[in-house]
Amino acid sequence: MREVTVRKGEPIDRALKRLKTKLDVEGILDEMRRRRAFETPMDERRRKARSASKRNKVKWRYSNKSEETASETAETPASAPEA
């Protein structure tokens, strides 16, 4: 169970926000919302496929940037000594 200690002079709203961000980062709120109602196997497959496509888009975006910088450095000729 996650807990947040309320600091001296800290408003309750701030402590609740810290708790919510902790739970959100760990994915506990999403898990709780998902388990609130029964999910059919087909719905589960759809949800997983959607999240996988989102992950792949992000991976593709970042992998392209690293490939572009690698190809740019490979395309520039090395300074060779002229004879």
From Swiss-Prot:
PANTHER family: MITOCHONDRIAL 28S RIBOSOMAL PROTEIN S21, SMALL RIBOSOMAL SUBUNIT PROTEIN BS21M
GO molecular function term, any single one: structural constituent of ribosome
Compositionally skewed regions (Low complexity) per UniProt: 71-83
Cellular compartments per GO CC: ribonucleoprotein complex; ribosome
Keywords associated with the record: Ribonucleoprotein, Ribosomal protein
Taxonomic source organism: Akkermansia muciniphila (strain ATCC BAA-835 / DSM 22959 / JCM 33894 / BCRC 81048 / CCUG 64013 / CIP 107961 / Muc)
Protein name per its UniProtKB record: Small ribosomal subunit protein bS21
UniProt family annotation: Belongs to the bacterial ribosomal protein bS21 family.
NCBIfam families registered for this protein in UniProt: S21p (TIGR00030)
Keyword Ribonucleoprotein: yes
GO BP annotation list: translation
Region described as Disordered: spans on this chain: 40-83
InterPro entries: Ribosomal_bS21, Ribosomal_bS21_sf
Pfam families attached to this UniProt entry: Ribosomal_S21
Keyword Metal-binding: no
Biased composition regions of type Basic residues, renumbered to the chain: 47-62
Superkingdom classification of source: Bacteria
Transmembrane parts of this sequence: none
